[in-house]
Amino acid sequence: MADLILSSSSAQSSLLHVRPNHYLLNTSTASPIRSVRFQNSNGFHPLAFASGHRRLPLGAVVPSDSTKTITSTITANCVDSGVKAVEVEPTIDYGGGGGIGGDKFGGGGGGGDGNDDGGEDDKEESDGKKSTPLSMSQKLTLGYAFLVGVGGLMGYLKSGSQKSLLAGGLSAAVLLYVFSQLPTKPVLASTVGVVMAGALMYVMGTRYMRSKKIFPAGVVSIMSFIMTGGYIHGIMRSLH
């Protein structure tokens, strides 16, 4: 059987009234109390009791010179072979450290702000990890896809050729796929990009030689030549 002695003290008064019937041993499990006694001493009102449980709560301690309710839950770990004495200083809730005992007990409320700041920092770090910046290859691929799509649309608007619109749309869709796969599968994405850029360079270069039109044939063919070299460089860098 473990014996536990709990002593409650107050910073403002040496007289405390202990209400053992308020939340005393408020637990759903059975706790056989063999003995309960009150002892008087200078500045303390010890409550001594014995129980078979190792964790015992104590609450509802009210000072004689205050109308505020001091609620304190005390949990102590006991050993079966000895007696432990715990001196309790109850925490008075006066809202942000004001009033009686505010300087001593109210300052602990700032810990929640630190936890909130830590949570916000963690959230910002997770957001920073999710929103990774685009690489130069992705930016060039995205601009290249936009240029090819606009070129196909311009060919359709000028000559009414649905073939130009379809070719421009499919080419832009493939380049968008390359854009999405570059961070995770750079070799595969660069290989698809080389094939697409080479095909566009040949087709648009041939059209430019016939029509001598700078846009879209001339601009797309030059951009395709640049992107072909860029994708080949990306493949070689990824393999090494």
UniProtKB/Swiss-Prot annotation:
Predominant cellular place of this UniProt entry's protein: plastid
Cytoplasm keyword on record: no
Domain of life where this protein originates: Eukaryota
Pfam family, one: Tmemb_14
Composition bias, Gly residues: 97-113
GO cellular component terms, semicolon-separated: chloroplast; chloroplast envelope; chloroplast membrane; cytosol; plastid
InterPro entries tied to this protein: TMEM14, TMEM14_sf
Topology in the lipid bilayer: Multi-pass membrane protein
Region of interest called Disordered, as start-end residue ranges on this chain: 97-134
Residue ranges with Acidic residues bias: 114-125
Function (record text): May be involved in free fatty acids export from the plastids.
Protein name, as recorded: Protein FATTY ACID EXPORT 2, chloroplastic
Gene assigned in the entry: FAX2
